[in-house]
Amino acid sequence: MKRSSLHRFFVRLSRKLEKLFSIDAVQSLWEHICRWTHPVSARRILATIDQAELERLRQHYPYRPNARRINAYEDATYWIGVNVKHVQDLWLDRAPPLDILDLGCGAGYFLYVCRLFGHEGLGLDIDEELFFRGTTRLLGVRRIIARIHPQTPLPDLGKKFDLVTGHRVCFHWITPDQRKEWTPADWEFFIHDIRTRFLKPRGRLLLEINPRPDGSSFFTPELRALFESQGARIFRRKALLAADRSERPRFKQV
């Protein structure tokens, strides 16, 4: 084997070993163990949804050629499974009843699963997708129609929450082509707004943020530093923050 080929081999091997023994890998393994020891049947949850009405919605709002991400949410089987994992990762399947606000609630699958475990949920999203309008009605998910803007407070909801979530967040992209995004100052404003106006004293904010268009992590060194300065616990694409900036939040909180 040539020296250059041997070098590339060891570089790839070292990267694989680094991933295998990283903190993220250990935490991921712990997530899988927790799900395995406390299983939740996504199939049973799916069976509680009116499949005939869901199919009617699919037929009424067929796939759109230029809306791949929205089209994907018509696969309720897949997304119920995904959101069961979200519920398990936050230990919501074994927690006492909580008040939950879901930012960018989309089709409403997450809040629907939460309700089956006794939690009270409210979604916040724009009203541009007719399919989402239909599914949230079908699932009985309450939502507030609003758009999240940088440096702008969210609308007053008249209450505070035990948990505020945002899964597959994309509201921080200012332009559709994802070339312009929120600044660290915009994120700091947003986090402060959530903490002071929407979280109860022991509340948590969970953000799962989509990777960048090139597949790299959302958390650039600058953004990671900003979130960590706010007391965030960062795990892969997720950031968990407590109501109190000085506290280190936990995914397990029952």
Where do the language-model regions lie?
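Conserved alpha-helix/loop element of class I SAM-dependent methyltransferases that forms part
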Residues: 76-97
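Conserved class I S-adenosyl-L-methionine
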Residues: 97-106
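A short SAM/SAH-binding and catalytic strip from SAM-dependent methyltransferases
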Residues: 163-184
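Conserved SAM-binding strand-loop segment of SAM-dependent methyltransferases
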Residues: 140-151
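A short acidic, Gly/Pro-enriched loop at the edge of an enzyme's catalytic core
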Residues: 154-163
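Conserved SAM-binding loop of SAM-dependent methyltransferases across substrates and taxa
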Residues: 107-118
